[in-house]
Swiss-Prot record:
Pathway: Cofactor biosynthesis; NAD(+) biosynthesis; quinolinate from iminoaspartate: step 1/1. Belongs to the quinolinate synthase family. Type 1 subfamily. GO terms for cellular component: cytosol. It catalyses: iminosuccinate + dihydroxyacetone phosphate = quinolinate + phosphate + 2 H2O + H(+). InterPro entries: NadA, NadA_sf, Quinolinate_synth_A_type1. Its main location: cytoplasm. Binds 1 [4Fe-4S] cluster per subunit. The gene is nadA. This is Quinolinate synthase. GO terms for molecular function: 4 iron, 4 sulfur cluster binding; metal ion binding; quinolinate synthetase A activity.
Length: 347
């Protein structure tokens, strides 16, 4: 049986949008970043949800564009002494936990995540203390402190497999922070999952009625859905999975049109994978509803060319990720469990 923890819904203020750059400014910052990466012995590690021009720059400079699991692996294994993490803050923290000897920089430390913000350590720790018989599994989209309180860290690409494994051992689960992903995992595994009530501001906005209307316009299109989406959206999907899994599904499915229910940043790499297919954004508004994120994380959008150049050039407290040594040791244990488990799955 799945029991749901009922917490108060929160609305987070969005950061201001970066000032648009003209073509000359973009070229200036691209060249500056390339030079600074070489001078700093640095490599870019970018998430699929960053803007296309950031992903393109990571490609051009020998960096990584991936989901959070592969970002963690890449940064730990790469020979660079400095990692420039283009993403949100928990990704930078994870990189520092796995690579403490490296200098981990971010374009801005103000790049948050609604899942991270929605799972403050004091409240979450008290929640765990109230259920001492449960194994604590937290999503990668959490702070270092929340990871340190967990038994396991997990990404969406291996979430179902891990919960199946723990359920086979007879363990009852606390899942945090994303309630939609928790619901999806519970439905797939039938495990005893007690969910924290967080949500991703992007995926939470996908609308069932509007998606139904879009499907009528494109009846032959396949629907690809990230499991951070509401259950009603997941139930309409032809394929459900993490960002990397959705890109694989786009290649595997025979459909020529794909409706994609995740952050539109994924379109850059997905379109590369299927250049002959048409990608359509799943609607986040319609039927009288409006959207706030409109299928793009506002904190991911903070990773602009100017901010990346400033992060590499200035470093310091405004850009460098620091994780307390004791906290790092505690958070490293569940992270290593995740990586070891993922290795057994060969993902």
């Amino acid at each position: 049986m799945s029991v749901m923890f009922d917490s108060q819904a929160a609305i987070y203020p969005f950061p201001p949008k970066p000032t648009p750059l003209n073509d000359d400014e973009k070229q200036f910052y691209r060249e500056k970043i390339k030079r600074l990466l070489k001078e700093r012995n640095a490599v870019m590690v970018a998430h699929y949800y960053t803007d296309p021009e950031i992903q393109q720059l990571a490609e051009e400079t020998g960096g990584c564009i991936s989901d959070s699991l592969e970002m963690a692996r890449f940064g730990a294994k790469h020979a660079a002494s400095t990692l420039l993490v283009a993403g949100v803050r928990f990704m930078g923290e994870t990189a520092k936990i796995l690579s403490p000897e490296k200098n981990v920089l971010m374009p801005t430390l103000a790049a948050e995540c609604s899942l991270d913000l929605g799972c403050p350590i004091d409240e979450f720790s008290a929640f765990c203390d109230a259920h001492p018989d449960r194994t604590v599994v937290v999503y990668a989209n959490t702070s270092a402190a929340v990871k340190a309180r967990a038994d396991w860290v997990v990404t969406s690409s291996i979430a179902v497999e891990l919960i199946e494994h723990l359920d086979s051992l007879g363990e009852k689960i606390i899942w945090a922070p994303d309630r939609h992903l928790g619901n999806y995992v519970q439905k797939q595994t039938r495990a005893d999952v007690l969910c924290w009530q967080g949500a991703c501001i992007v995926h939470d906005e996908f609308k069932t009625q509007a998606l139904t209307r879009l499907k009528k316009i494109y009846p032959d299109a396949a629907i690809l859905v990230h499991p951070e989406s509401p259950r009603s959206i997941v139930e309409m999907a032809d394929a459900v999975g993490s960002t990397s899994q959705l890109i694989k599904a786009a290649k595997t499915l025979p459909h020529r049109q794909l409706i994609v229910a995740t952050d539109r940043g994924i379109f850059y790499k997905m379109q590369q994978a299927v250049p002959d297919k048409e990608l359509l954004e799943a609607p986040t508004a319609g039927e009288g509803a409006t959207c706030r994120s409109c299928a793009h994380c506002p904190w991911m959008a903070m990773n602009g060319l100017k901010a990346i150049a400033e992060g590499l050039e200035q470093g310091g407290a405004a850009h460098e990720i620091q994780v307390d040594a004791a906290l790092r040791e505690s958070a490293l244990l569940p992270l290593n469990r995740m990586l070891d488990f993922a290795a057994t799955l060969r993902v």
